[in-house]
Amino acid sequence: MRAAVWRFDQVDREGKVIRPSRGNAPQESAPRWLADHGVPLIKEKAITNNASPFQITNCDIFHPIYHERYLRFIRALGRSGIPALDAVKVAYLCDKSATNGEEGWTEADQPTSGEGWQRYRERLATWAEAFGPKRHVLMTVSSKPQVLAECYRLGIGQRNGFVEMYLGHLDNAAMGQAVDADGYLLIDDQCPPIANGYAWGDENEEYGRGWTARFGPYETFGHRYRESMLRALQMRRNYLLVDRSDLDPALLHYVCLELGRTIDDTPDAWCYLRETPTRQFPKGVRNFERWLHQRDRAGARTVAVDRYDIAKQNTHSFDFTARRTDAATGQYKIGFALDDRFLSGGPHRVVFKVTYRDEGRPIWRLAYDAPRAGSSPCRVECTGTGEIRTATFFRDDVRFGATGLDFDFAIEAERGDAMIKFVRVIRLGAATGGQGSPK
């Protein structure tokens, strides 16, 4: 719920007001009757790298006059019965900010000490009480560990608004994200909103042509869209707002089918073999993984390849979007470990889908454990087109006998080097995974 913005002025790229507020803009969410109660106003910093630059003036939402009336409103909302309606699927708990979403990130927006923190906690507790048994549909817009700990204690989820900056929050344990010593991006499935099925969302937006000032050439937006959508799935998000359906309709359709899936009911597991050196992790952050893991070790050490340059991102300047074997140094394999809860033992009926760059004339094969000798080989001979292609292999005899991060199967280069971008395992028939996250 938005209720903080008192004034919304349009400005130029230098922050000068060019179209002052008339007091009736849709962004001006604060009730006009507050003018009679002396609520202090806060003029925020102008946002000038937006498609349409603006400057917001907010109410001081933690001032006693505002705060007391805000809590009364939320209690009345709870008594109205509206939260119990089936139509209410998710609800954002907005704060205040200089940006257009009342999303907050500064200490003034989301205080974590003193009287401000006490009032912030009162806001959260009042929302939880108003929604009662449906409090799990509430989403704080904060990513601060202290705020999230309080939300999780109350049974409230979380929503970010900026997954298009797809390498944000790489190392935020409160959101289940970490980067290990080898650079692999990890996910903690026991993070409360993931484990307990709270609303757990994000927004993937800012893809119109007016956003080139922030993100660079429009022709690069398709890459950013794809990376962002896959990052949302890596984070186990179960809610996603998108503002474009035409950049990659097939990917959007896939994401819609995947959102909210757990290890128990997901039809597939996948690994995107990407790597990006960032300012925070200059040696590189590896892979987006969803229950399928790739790891380097002796005989299976890989090289990041297929570079895509980024025009304007404040975290990094390029992405590697594939990994290859390194036959010249005796590294002929790319090894994969499937989450034991997804499939273990066997034999199982599965589909392997391997997306690769058809560069040069290498030959590679998919090697897996099968109980019967003589199974037809899963072999690919590249033809040098330079295209991105996907090889699909249907198999009904696959055993996944390894445990943990030991390899269940591998891509093996027979001639030259295999350049692999994305590997997906689809289980056929009834789901046979172990115990996953509660629904």
Model-based region annotation:
Residues 1-115, 142-151:
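Aromatic-lined carbohydrate-binding surfaces of glycoside hydrolases
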Residues 362-374:
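Short, surface-exposed beta-strand/strand-loop-strand elements in extracellular ectodomains
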Residues 4, 355-361, 396-398:
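Solvent-exposed strand-to-loop "edge" motifs in beta-rich extracellular domains
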Residues 392-425:
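Extracellular beta-strand ligand-recognition surfaces/modules
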Residues 373-403:
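Extracellular carbohydrate recognition and processing domains
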Residues 268-343, 372, 426:
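Glycan-recognition and processing domains
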Residues 92-199:
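Substrate-binding cleft/loops of secretory-pathway carbohydrate-active enzymes
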Residues 158-291:
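Substrate-binding cleft of secreted/luminal carbohydrate-active enzymes
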